[in-house]
Amino acid sequence: MDRIRIKINHQSLIDLQQLVQQLQVPIPPTLIAAKTNFTNLQIQIDRDPLGVNQTFNRDLTSLIDHTRHELETLSQQCQHLQTRLMIARQQLAQLQQLERDSIATYTESQAKFSHSLPPIAPLPAEELTAMEQWLERLVAKFESGTIAPVSMGLTNWTNKIQAYTTAARSALAANRLPLDTRQELRGRLDALSAKALAKGKAEDPILADLVIQARQVLYTSPIALDLAMDLVKRYEQRLNQ
């Protein structure tokens, strides 16, 4: 019976050693103690099979069970951290796309509008590069077997990228606002012009002059949105008189 148990324990130690290698972590002290215990137990059985101390065997089994629990917990932590790192890559890619969109919108807004307030500049490129390099370092440490420090570092990284993402979305929305407003004004002017035609007022000199002015402002860069809004409003008021 002892030799059967020896074989079971031996296979358990092999499995645990393989798990340590897969996790790329230092050998736990409990596994070292279990290996030493196993070697001593083998020697004792070889010398005096009938004199094997059952307590000694139970101690070995307890060490193996404790080590297995410790490594399985660590394995779960690794899997969870691996998932978090995958999500972090997705968050970084999302921020990078937001920045590309923000830069394009910022450039277009700068070129096409005369602003009373300057548009919001995108995130500096060096900040985005720093976030990318930071994540690469965390991944490298994780792959070398570091768990707890990587988890803490990733939490800090995630907090920062979430703040950057919120800022990037706000910048994109702010820079898109004049573009969206221009499009909305163009649509309103077209609808009002159609309404004027339907009501037989398209030839009204004041309406005709207002629509010409509004179209010129809305389709000529740089666009003065305040003036365009005023012209469309005046056109609507005149039409509804």
Predicted regions and their residues:
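Long, charged/polar-rich coiled-coil alpha-helical scaffolds that serve as structural arms
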Residues: 55, 59-62, 66-69, 73-76, ...
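Terminal, compositionally biased segments
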Residues: 14-25, 32, 36, 62-65, ...
